[in-house]
Structures are given as C-alpha cells and as structure tokens.
Design a protein with these regions (language model features):
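N-terminal strand-loop element at the rim of the active site
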Residues: 10-63
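An aromatic- and histidine-rich active-site surface loop
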Residues: 32, 64-69, 80-115
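A conserved mid-protein helix/loop that constitutes part of the nucleotide-sugar donor-binding site
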Residues: 6, 190-213, 226-233, 278, ...
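Acidic donor-binding loop of glycosyltransferase active sites
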Residues: 142, 243, 260-275, 288
Length: 375
C-alpha cells in the first residue's frame, strides 16, 4: 500500500495505544464483489477494518456502491464520538447524506486537492460534479488538518475554510534504529531508490531520463501502477536496463530492505498532488539522503531541507536532477551527512507519537489546540 495507507494504519494503532477505540472503513485494494470485515493485527494489538468492495476504478477513483451502507453499519456498531475523514476520497463524501454520520463531530484530514493545474479535463469534469458534496463536508467539519504550511496557500477548495485549518505534519512509526547508518561505499555505483505507486504525477519518466545522463549510478524503482508499461518502454528505449530495475509491488519488509541498501531516495514528483511524501519520512528514518523536486505548493521541499537533510532540484528538469544525483555520486560523504541529519529531523518532527498527540488534541481528548497553531 501507499504512503497514505501506511500513515492511516500507523495513526490507528498509535491512537489505540493512547486509549482510543478505533475502527476504519477503506476500499478493497483490487476489484472485489464483496466487502470484508476483519480484525487487523499488529504487535499484540488489533483494529477493526471494514473493506468496502471496489467494483472498478474510474479516473483513479475507486467505485464502491456499498461504501455508504458499510459506513452506516459501522457507525451503528461503533457509535463513535468523532469521524475522521481522509480526503480526497469521493466515497467518504457519502457521509454528507447519512443522518447518523451528520450527528457526529467530523475532523477532515486533507491529503491533497482532487484536481490541480495538471489534471486531465475528464478529472476536472468529474470534480465539478463532486465539488458541492466536498464543500458540504468541509462546512460540516470542526477542523481540517493539512500536513504542511506550504500546501494551504495553494489549495483552492480550502480557501474559504482557512480559519478551521490546522497544520499537523504526518508521522510514521520507526522501523529503523539510529545505529543502522550504512556508509555509502565509494568503489561501487551510487544506489538510488524510488518507492511508490507508478502514477502519472510521480515524475519517474524525468528520473529515468536523468539516470540516462549519468554514470556510475544505479536505480531501483519499487511499486506498481498505471505507468508501469510506459516506464519499461523508456528503460528499453534509453538502453539503461543494466543500471535500472523495476521491481513492481513489494511488501513493507522488502521496501525497508531496499531503503537500507540504498544511498539515497529520489521523489521527483511533478505536481502538487504530491502534497507531502510519506516516503520521505521512511527514508529519513532510515538515515538516507532525499532528493526532491521544488513543486510549488507541495510539502516535499518543506519536509526536506535543501543542503541539510537532502537536495532540492528544479521541477521537471532532467539536467538539474542528473546534476544533483551526480553530485551525490561524487561526494559520498555528503550523502551520509544528509541522511544522518534527516534521521535527526525525523526524530524531532515526524514520529507517529507526535502526530497522534496533535490529532487527538483535536478530538477533544487533550487540551484544545492553541490559536497560534491554527493555519
């Protein structure tokens, strides 16, 4: 699963450890005729997870006719004090029409806007239909959480609701020990890893063309998605298959191994749809340098401090990315230093305990958040 799913599960289990009773409703990963209910287990703990059947996807949106029924049923079963909606997710907007849901306090976690300047006309048309319900949900919510201060000024849907917006950075649990620094070995190629769904906005085509311009650099792309076949074609057309490997989907343990064995992580996303980049936290927790694009209105270059915890390059620039990677190839100590500072920043700002404490304060379980923290 992707970064948002990782964050959501970490938040659920961390909230449970803080004394909350939690349950989640999500979509099935692939196409499914029937919904499922399971107790999702992790480290002697468990959380109720309802997976609403996804019939198919339209413009990357899961179509799940049973979502509203499953949500009503879950509310009746759990009788929650708070509903925490992770948007964008058109299925979650069924909450607007469910009387039992409307009687409960809502917190919205705004992960990204559905449409950006780069979105297709079809997605923009679909959004025109969804927008009134999205507006109703935002109006009903007590708070709207955004993950970085750089995102909010560029979000058109949130423009009218800035007074209820609160910035809480995402966080993840620590899968790496600080002692696990892996030195970048000079007498082998620089190892770059890219983790995540092969989506249109991820900029992997830019990364492949940049790798083609470099020497002594190897790339592992870990993930699957709609761009897989076009990326394979680029690899073949550029004749870089000896240095580039596309691995497809991987388990969490396999992803951790790829991070451990790499020298740096590259997230070359080209669009504000990449509002934060949870994978950056995974790399920083593993003491790896991060290379990111300077997308305006994204949190990527806020999470990664240029020349401190990573390097930021000009968005969509093949030559700038190639030069950035060459710099790390030439200066392996820089890669190590950036990674170690990234680990420190992760510990100070992006642990799951920190984000959980801030989120629970909005639920009313802790003292109300101070005015200075409101966006």
């Amino acid at each position: 699963h992707g970064g948002m799913e990782t964050y959501m599960m970490d938040l659920l289990f961390s909230s449970k450890q803080h004394g909350m009773e939690c349950a989640a409703i999500v979509h099935t990963t692939g196409r499914a005729a029937a919904s499922t209910v399971e107790e999702y287990k992790r480290d002697h703990d468990q959380v109720l997870v309802v997976r609403a059947a996804t019939w198919f996807k339209f413009l990357y949106v899961p179509i799940s006719p049973s979502f509203a029924w499953n949500l009503s049923r879950l509310i009746a079963r759990q009788r929650p004090d708070v509903i925490h909606l992770h948007l964008p997710n058109p299925s979650a907007l069924w909450s607007v029409f469910i009387p039992s849901a409307r009687r409960i306090t809502w917190i919205i976690h705004w992960q990204s806007d559905i449409v950006t300047a780069d979105s297709s006309w079809m997605l923009k048309t679909l959004y025109w239909l969804i927008r009134p319900f999205e507006y109703s949900a935002l109006k009903k919510a007590r708070y709207v959480i955004t993950s970085s201060p750089t995102f909010l000024p560029y979000s058109l849907p949130l423009r009218r609701f800035r007074k209820k917006c609160v910035t809480i950075p995402l966080g993840i649990r620590d899968n790496f020990e600080k002692s696990e620094y892996h030195n970048s070995i000079r007498d082998r190629p620089l190892r770059v890893v890219a983790l995540g769904r092969l989506a249109h906005y991820k900029g992997y085509d830019v990364l492949l063309r940049a790798i083609h311009r470099t020497k002594n650099i190897e790339l592992d792309i870990v993930g699957d998605g709609e761009q897989a076949s076009s990326l394979k074609k680029i690899v073949n057309d550029l004749a870089i298959s000896k240095r580039v490997r596309l691995h497809g989907a991987a388990t969490d343990a396999e992803k951790d191994r790829f991070l451990r064995e790499s020298d740096c992580l590259c997230l070359p996303s080209t669009d504000r749809t990449e509002s934060f980049g949870v994978v950056l936290l995974e790399a920083m927790s593993a003491s790896k340098a991060c290379v990111v694009s300077d997308v305006e209105g994204s949190g990527m270059s806020w999470v990664v401090d240029h020349e401190v915890t990573g390097l930021v390059f000009k968005n969509r620039s093949i030559s700038a990315l190639a030069a950035t990677l060459e710099r790390l190839e030439q200066d392996r100590q820089l890669a190590i230093d950036l990674g170690q500072k990234g680990r420190t920043k992760y510990e100070q700002n992006f642990t799951i305990d920190q984000t959980t404490a801030a989120v629970l304060s909005l639920y009313g379980r802790r003292p109300a958040i101070s005015e200075s923290q409101k966006g």
